[in-house]
C-alpha cells in the first residue's frame, strides 16, 4: 500500500513539474487567451448579409471588445474586402467497385484589407483549408451531417486565422 501511494506522489510531482515548465516557457493552448490587440478601432466587413463566415467573424471581432463593426466603409478605419469564398468537394479515393470511399473537402477564401484612404494594409491573401471525409453509401444522412460539421469547423478555423492576421497587420503611416 505504501509503495502505491509513493508511486502516485511521484507521478503527481512529475506532472506538476511538466505543467509548470511548459507554462513557464510561455506556452499557451491556441485560443486559450483569445485576446488580440487590433491596430484599428473600427472595421467594415465586406461580406454579403447572408454569409455565415461574415456573421461569425463579426461575432468574434465584437467579442474582443476593442473593435466597432461599421455599417459603411466610409465610417471605418479599416475595410475588409472579401475577394472570393468557395467550398469544394472532390473524390479522394474509390473502393474496388469504383464507388467513392473518401472525399476531400476544401474551403478557400481570399481577402484584402485597406484603410479608409484605400491604401492596402494586407495584400490579397488566400487561405485554404482541407479535410478528408470517409464516405459510406449506407449512411448517407450521417455523412451529410458530418460534411456540414466539417465545413463549420473549417469556417471557425478561417475566422481565427483572419483575426490573427488582422491583429498582426501594421497600420499605414
Predicted feature residues:
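C-terminal/domain-edge helix-coil "capping" segments
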Residues: 141-173
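A structural "domain/chain start" motif
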Residues: 2-4, 8-11, 21-66, 171-173
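Surface-exposed short loop/turn segments
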Residues: 81-126, 130-145
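Sec/Tat-exported extracytoplasmic proteins
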Residues: 61, 65, 113, 117, ...
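Soluble non-cytosolic domains of exported or imported proteins
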Residues: 47-55, 100, 104, 144-157
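Alpha-helical transmembrane segments
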Residues: 12-16
Amino acid at each position: 500500500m505504501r509503495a502505491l501511494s509513493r508511486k502516485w506522489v511521484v507521478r503527481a510531482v512529475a506532472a506538476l513539474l511538466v505543467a509548470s515548465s511548459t507554462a513557464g516557457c510561455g506556452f499557451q493552448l491556441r485560443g486559450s487567451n483569445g485576446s488580440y490587440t487590433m491596430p484599428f478601432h473600427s472595421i467594415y466587413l465586406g461580406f454579403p448579409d447572408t454569409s455565415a463566415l461574415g456573421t461569425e467573424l463579426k461575432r468574434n471581432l465584437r467579442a474582443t471588445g476593442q473593435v466597432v463593426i461599421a455599417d459603411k466603409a466610409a465610417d471605418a478605419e479599416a475595410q475588409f474586402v472579401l475577394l472570393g469564398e468557395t467550398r469544394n468537394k472532390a473524390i479522394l479515393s474509390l473502393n474496388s467497385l469504383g464507388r467513392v470511399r473518401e472525399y476531400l473537402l476544401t474551403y478557400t477564401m481570399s481577402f484584402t484589407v485597406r484603410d479608409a484612404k484605400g491604401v492596402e494594409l494586407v495584400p490579397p491573401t488566400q487561405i485554404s483549408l482541407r479535410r478528408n471525409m470517409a464516405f459510406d453509401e449506407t449512411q448517407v444522412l450521417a455523412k451529410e451531417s458530418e460534411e456540414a460539421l466539417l465545413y463549420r469547423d473549417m469556417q471557425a478555423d478561417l475566422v481565427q486565422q483572419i483575426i490573427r492576421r488582422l491583429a498582426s497587420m501594421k497600420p499605414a503611416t
